[in-house]
C-alpha cells in the first residue's frame, strides 16, 4: 500500500517526526528516522522501514492513528523546526540536529 505525505512536523534533536498521511484513510504516523518525509512524497511501508523513490530507508514507526485535527494543530504549534530566527540568517540554530539533510535548506 502506498502512502502520500500531506504534512510533516519534525523534532530535530531526537529525530522524532509526525506526518499526516493519506493511505486508505487520513492518518497521523509517529516515527523516528534520519530522513525527512516532505509533503507530496509517496512511500510504501515495509518490514524494515519504508521505500521512498525506489530506495529503502530504515525508520521506526511508533504509532499510527486516525487523523485528528486538534491533535495535528497541537503538534504543529509545538514544532521545533525550523525556528523563526533561522529564516533570517539561513543557519540552523539546532546544534544537535540529527537529520542528515535539512528539509528547510538551512546550513
Swiss-Prot record:
Compartment(s) where it occurs, according to its Swiss-Prot or TrEMBL record: Cytoplasm
UniProt xrefs under InterPro entries: Anti-adapter_IraM, PmrD_sf
Superkingdom classification of source: Bacteria
Presence of the UniProt keyword S-adenosyl-L-methionine in the record: no
Induction: By magnesium and calcium starvation, via the transcriptional regulator PhoP.
GO MF annotation: an example: anti-sigma factor antagonist activity
GO-annotated biological processes: cellular response to acidic pH; cellular response to magnesium starvation; negative regulation of protein catabolic process
Keywords of this entry: Cytoplasm, Stress response
Gene Ontology cellular-component annotations: cytoplasm
Membership in a protein family: Belongs to the IraM/RssC family.
Functional summary from the UniProt entry: Inhibits RpoS proteolysis by regulating RssB activity, thereby increasing the stability of the sigma stress factor RpoS during magnesium starvation. May also be involved in the early steps of isoprenoid biosynthesis, possibly through its role as RssB regulator.
Protein name stated in the entry: Anti-adapter protein IraM
Originating gene: iraM
Amino acid at each position: 500500500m502506498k502512502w502520500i505525505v500531506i504534512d510533516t512536523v519534525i523534532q530535530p534533536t531526537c529525530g522524532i517526526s509526525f506526518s499526516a498521511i493519506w493511505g486508505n484513510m487520513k492518518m497521523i504516523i509517529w516515527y523516528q528516522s534520519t530522513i525527512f518525509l516532505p509533503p507530496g512524497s509517496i512511500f510504501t511501508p515495509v518490514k524494515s522501514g519504508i521505500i521512498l523513490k525506489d530506495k529503502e530507508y530504515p525508520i521506526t514507526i511508533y504509532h499510527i492513528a486516525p487523523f485528528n485535527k486538534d491533535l495535528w494543530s497541537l503538534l504543529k504549534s509545538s514544532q521545533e523546526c525550523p525556528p523563526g530566527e533561522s529564516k533570517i540568517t539561513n543557519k540552523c540554530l539546532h546544534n544537535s540536529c540529527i537529520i542528515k539533510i535539512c528539509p528547510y535548506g538551512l546550513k
